[in-house]
Amino acid sequence: MNSFVIRNGFGLVRTFNTRLFTTSTQNLEGELKTILGQAKVSKLQEKLKLDPRSKITFNDFKGIAKEVGIEEKEINSVSNALAQSGSIIYLPNSLNENLKTSVFTKPAHIYQSLEHILDIENKGVGLNKLIESKKSEINSLRQKIQPLEEKKQVIDRKAHRRATAIIWTGLGYCFAQAAILARLTWWDLSWDIIEPVSYFLTFGSVLIGYTYFTMTKTEFTYEALNHRLFSKRQDKLFKRNNFPKEDYENLVQAIDKKEKELKELELATKYDHTH
């Protein structure tokens, strides 16, 4: 029997079809599941937006998806759906192993970088031509910086030798001080006389270290002292040899920038070959 009857207090009779009732219940359950699934995907998108990283591994993506309640068997379909909608960049079929196992959670940043590098407003320039042009620019900059690099290496060696010599002189002073105190204690004088002298020498060493820390705002360590002595001597040699420090630093920054752009162009070429 596929129906039942309900009689109300006024004697009116109403017949309900159980088949229709069951079907509507099933539809409702399906709609609820769809809504819950969409809510989980929405939570996943929010988590990815809040994540400061612009690139994560697919395993990290799976971990975040599981945190919001998405089941293991649904993760692949969810990732593909998000990739198709443009919410993420995921290339599981890429020939590049790094791209294949990575998820770019901030696709807008990638698109902006590509637009900036490729200069999309100037149409008609191929990626390979851009790469060759970028390599030519880098080679030109390296030729400009080479004589400065050679000159700087000579200056750096001199500055390093001076810093090392001063540090070894300090060590020699410590040994000489210990030898003189030993001589005065056991041969010329006695410990009763040398004790206050050694106390003030120790206190003076601590005072020198504290003064160094106060003046330079750096710890009184071997690394800090060596770096400071090296930098001081290097600056003096730069001035003495008329070394264009500013030009050199600008060239270094320009080369670094061009090399980063070249890497991004080469990555874009690999991406282009997979599509």
From Swiss-Prot:
Residues 1-28 form a transit peptide. GO terms for cellular component: mitochondrion; uniplex complex. The keyword RNA-binding does not apply. One of its GO terms (biological process) is mitochondrial calcium ion homeostasis. Residues 187-192 are mitochondrial intermembrane. Residues 125-157, 244-270 form a coiled coil. Keywords: Calcium, Calcium channel, Calcium transport, Coiled coil, Ion channel, Ion transport, Membrane, Metal-binding, Mitochondrion, Mitochondrion inner membrane, Transit peptide, Transmembrane, Transmembrane helix, Transport. It is a multi-pass membrane protein. It is found in: Mitochondrion inner membrane. A motif (Selectivity filter) lies at residues 191-199. The selectivity filter, in which calcium ions are arranged in single file, is composed of two acidic rings separated by one helical turn along the central axis of the channel pore. Mitochondrial inner membrane calcium uniporter that mediates calcium uptake into mitochondria. Constitutes a pore-forming and calcium-conducting subunit. Mitochondrial calcium homeostasis plays key roles in cellular physiology and regulates cell bioenergetics, cytoplasmic calcium signals and activation of cell death pathways. Sufficient to operate as a pore-forming channel without the need of calcium-sensor or auxiliary subunit. Belongs to the MCU (TC 1.A.77) family. PANTHER family: CALCIUM UNIPORTER PROTEIN, MITOCHONDRIAL. This is Calcium uniporter protein, mitochondrial. The lineage of its organism: Eukaryota, Amoebozoa, Evosea, Eumycetozoa, Dictyostelia. The gene is mcu.
